[in-house]
Design a protein with these regions (language model features):
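Active-site-adjacent structural elements in enzyme catalytic cores
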Residues: 1-183
């Protein structure tokens, strides 16, 4: 659910949800985002459910957001699955092209961000049932409902995000990759 502070001159989204920023702006005019949404540790969240890892899976989870990192995700997942059972939560096109193995589960959230908004927690619970040791999740753009989805996804991952540089470093060193996967 979306939480908005309307006590100031400009409304501020404290927690993004089903009512998007764009929808609010059509009614209220300019709407800002609470700086705490960016994940700055020094800022105290002003809405409930914003501070701690929330609806988190049992496994370690990492969000992969940038396009270069997403290109490397299939190889990272395949290599990680050599050390533990892994899962990738991703959209239609990526899910269709990734190769499943006995230790690598590909969980398809569908074709658009609205589908992911509906399925995210169900997919995280599925990872728990599958007993995976590590989860990689494809990020989405933060327009519309994507802002709320990414907020929930980052919280579930404990704000752990992998960049292309992170993935390249892990893929260059199998000892480091094994340590990363099993930590």
């Amino acid at each position: 659910s979306t939480i908005v502070d309307t006590t100031g001159e400009v409304p501020v989204i404290l927690r993004p949800g089903g009512i998007t920023r764009e929808q609010l702006e059509k009614v209220l005019g300019r709407v800002e985002l609470d700086p705490a949404l960016a994940g700055a540790e020094t800022l105290k969240p002003r809405a409930p459910g914003m501070k701690y890892r929330h609806y988190a899976p049992k496994a370690k989870m990492y969000v992969v957001e940038d396009k270069e990192a997403l290109k490397l995700l299939p190889l990272l997942a395949k290599e990680a699955a050599k050390f533990t059972t892994a899962a990738v939560i991703c959209g239609g096109a990526a899910a269709e092209t990734m190769q499943r193995t006995q230790n690598l589960h590909i969980l398809n959230w569908g074709s658009d961000t609205t589908e992911l908004a509906v399925k995210l927690y169900r997919l995280l619970r599925r990872c728990d049932k599958l007993g995976v040791g590590i989860i990689f999740s494809e990020g989405v753009t933060e327009d519309g409902i994507g802002l709320a989805v990414m907020n929930r996804m980052r919280k579930a991952a404990g704000r752990q995000v992998l960049t292309a540089a992170d993935i390249e470093a892990l893929l260059k060193n199998s000892t480091q990759l094994k340590s990363f996967v099993l930590k």
